[in-house]
Amino acid sequence: MTRTRLAAVWCSLLIMLSSCASDQLADAPTPAVNPSPTTSPTLPSPSSSARLNKPPAKPQRTSVTVVMNGDLLWHNTLWFGAKEDAQRRGKGGYDFAPLLAGIKPVIASADLAICHEEVPLARLGGPYRNYPVFAAPPHVVKAISATGYDVCTTASNHAVDQGFAGVKRTLDDLDHAKIAHAGTARTKAESERPTIFTTRQGVKIGIVAATFSLNGIPMPEGKPWAVQRMSAKNLLAQAHRARVAGADIVLAAVHVGTEYSTSENAEQVRLARALTASPDVDLVYMHHPHVVQPWTRMNKKWVLYGVGNTVAQQVAPRTYEGVTGRFTFTRVGNGRFTVSKAEYIPTLVTAYRPGRPARLYQVSVALKTAKGSFRGRLLDAQRRTTATVTRKHPHGLMRG
């Protein structure tokens, strides 16, 4: 074999070896720079991560607004005006709705509105009776309902002016108008059954009521339960029954005080202290003096010593001035309801004149358009009511 041929053979062998080596390198796996572990950790999905970082939900807040005011004391001149109002509309009977129309926006907008039906109702057609032994036209109930009241308290010194028949008739008429009531009863069982109003939010509000006096008229024979009489023991027992029945809030309405006095008396103070000391009572308000009295806080709860008259036709100018309380109760989460906003709303009812029926006004609204002597009268009412209600400087009270 020549040297040239031998060289050619070696070259061929080298090329073949090189080709095989290249094929083996090409078939070999490429080593990983960062080899993965045998089991990979599970990473949270974006939605899981969002849940982990989401702040806790705020507790739910529930609020309800309650309004209450004073005596619906149906003097005969109020009937006269209601008869004139009915005649203007071409109707017979009595129309009391125009009398109360001025306060309707406040009453109708509340979650619960409470009136005080001071006197018993007569049967349709009468006889209707004025002071001192009342029997009001039953037409008043239609106006009370149309104004937006949900509940009326009925325990007062005039509750048995027409005997047990008057008690029963009044409650029957309120029932017919779908207005709840507290303070008087037709049966013993009814007297023991708590009055609880359920708001549109599902909040249950109990109303308990009692009166200090029946003007010397005996309780109907054999019916000692017909009217709730005032004592801390009785009111607290009522409040406890309301709590047991599921009430979230309990309001105590008491007919007590010195007539025509703009200051609370010792009896009112003692009663307020006893009631507010109980966890079963959330707010106390009082009527009977026919004039506004101070409001205060006791045991961290609101006490309204006097809300004055809502409608009446008495002599003293102050008896035409009243005040409506508006309280917002709020609960956070599963806690108790407490007052988160407290307001007083001065009112004024005008005197009847033939051809000019009485009218009830929300003072702040009427002042926007009133002129002359009527404006001056409204300003006097606002000043007097504000000075009296705030005399004890209750923290957090606002004028509505």
Question: What is the meaning of each model-derived region?
Answer:
Residues 1-13:
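N-terminal export and membrane-targeting signals
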Residues 16-19:
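C-terminal motif of bacterial Sec signal peptides marking the signal peptidase cleavage site
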Residues 21-400:
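Acidic, metal/ion-coordinating pockets
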